[in-house]
A protein has these predicted regions:
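Surface-exposed loop and turn segments in beta-propeller and other repeat-based domains
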Residues: 82-96, 132-159, 194-212, 255
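Flexible "stalk/tail and boundary" regions
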Residues: 23-24, 38, 68-86, 100-111, ...
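Bacterial N-terminal signal peptides that target proteins for export
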Residues: 1-8
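Short, solvent-exposed loop/turn segments at conserved positions within beta-propeller repeat blades
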Residues: 64-69, 116-117, 180-181, 236-242, ...
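Residue position within the beta-strands of beta-propeller blades
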Residues: 59-62, 113-114, 176-178, 229-232, ...
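Post-signal peptide N-terminal segment of mature Sec-exported envelope proteins
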Residues: 28-52, 73
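Bacterial Sec-dependent N-terminal signal peptides
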Residues: 2, 13-38
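Beta-rich, blade/repeat-based domains predominating
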Residues: 43-55, 69, 90-110, 150-175, ...
């Protein structure tokens, strides 16, 4: 018995040492491990937000073509795509782009889905859904009007606009929403009551002759167990190197976690509980430059680029220790990054 116990103890120690070496390799900021992006799923119509469930299924929002054809699909571990919920509001924005669904989260068999066009939070019980089942129309889902509360709220800097974009669960079961239109974080209590946790400040205008501050445009939110981390896009003209990650306390106090980014569109927590952010693209003379998206790991002292060359990525979700899923809005794909 003692020999068997000793062998098991030795095996546990070896596994622990191997795990530590893997962590050390991953967290080497001076020489981060090389990672690549591979095609995981294709043929999606404007894929944006991602959520991974305990079975390894990937739930993804598709903005659609602007003709009320937004949908939520599920991707099985072998990369097959199945529609789950269809007919979400989708319109053509003043910029000529399709707009509608934002991000989603999965919790205990329920999807929480945001739509910035109709200003609603949708709740879908997918606990019994099996890939291949007939999809449901969005009109059958329970929904809650969030935008009316946001637009009526007397913000100190009031845009009089709402664009529900990203969300995350926080302490006490609250759901926290990054509103890219109002530049704010909205709290929805477990009973559905709404309040404002924090307003996300703009930045000084760095352009010649620019006087009005540039909006923060919060695009991503995560809770690391102590505080919220919020990624920002920054408004037009999307100045290079001016986007930030803000940290927001549970009481709503806002401060800069790290700056020096460009056009951030999503944020995830890495295996060390530090933020990994997604750059949409670098601004160019003709707008955002294709294939200039990147993934960056950030600490309070350093930003480390993990991968470049992504084509207009929009969402990121962690899959495993050093593996992520990323959507490509332009290519209609979900990529596996590892």
């Amino acid at each position: 018995m003692r020999t068997k116990s000793s062998a098991l103890l030795l095996l546990a120690v070896l596994l622990l040492l191997g795990s530590c070496r893997e962590h050390d390799k991953y967290f080497d900021e001076a020489k981060p491990p090389a990672i690549t992006a591979k095609e995981f799923a294709t043929g999606l119509a404007g894929p944006l937000g991602l959520a991974v469930d305990p079975k390894g299924h990937v739930w993804v929002t598709e903005v659609g073509t602007g003709h009320n054809d937004g949908k939520v699909s599920v991707i099985t571990p072998n990369g097959k795509v199945y529609p789950v919920i269809t007919q979400f509001a989708s319109v053509i924005s003043p910029e000529g782009l399709a707009a509608g669904l934002g991000h989603l989260v999965y919790k205990d068999g329920v999807l929480y889905i945001l739509n910035g066009v109709d200003g609603k939070l949708y709740l879908a019980d997918v606990s019994s859904f099996k890939p291949g089942d007939a999809p449901r129309p969005a009109s059958e889902l329970r929904s809650e009007d969030i935008a009316t509360f946001v637009i009526a709220y007397p913000f100190e800097v009031d845009t009089e606009f709402s664009n529900l974009y990203n969300l995350a669960f926080g302490p006490d079961g609250g759901l926290y929403i990054a509103d890219a239109g109002a530049n704010a974080v909205i709290r929805r209590s477990p009973s559905g009551q709404l309040s404002v946790l924090a307003a996300i400040p703009g930045i000084p205008n760095p352009t010649p002759g620019g006087t009005a501050p540039i909006d923060a445009v919060p695009t991503g939110i995560v809770y690391d167990g102590e505080k919220f981390l919020v990624s920002t896009l920054t408004g037009f003209p999307f100045p290079e190197g001016k986007a930030r990650i803000y940290q927001v306390s549970k009481e709503g106090l806002v401060s800069v976690y790290r700056d020096g980014f460009t056009a951030l569109v999503d944020i995830a927590l890495g295996p060390d509980n530090r933020p990994v952010v997604l750059q949409f693209a670098a601004p160019g003379p003709q707008g955002f430059a294709p294939s200039s998206g990147r993934i960056t790991r950030s600490t309070t002292s350093q930003n480390t680029v993990l991968l470049e060359g992504l084509n207009l990525p929009a969402g990121i979700a962690r899959r495993s220790l050093r593996s992520y899923y990323v959507t490509s809005l332009a290519d209609g794909k979900v990529l596996r990054v590892e």
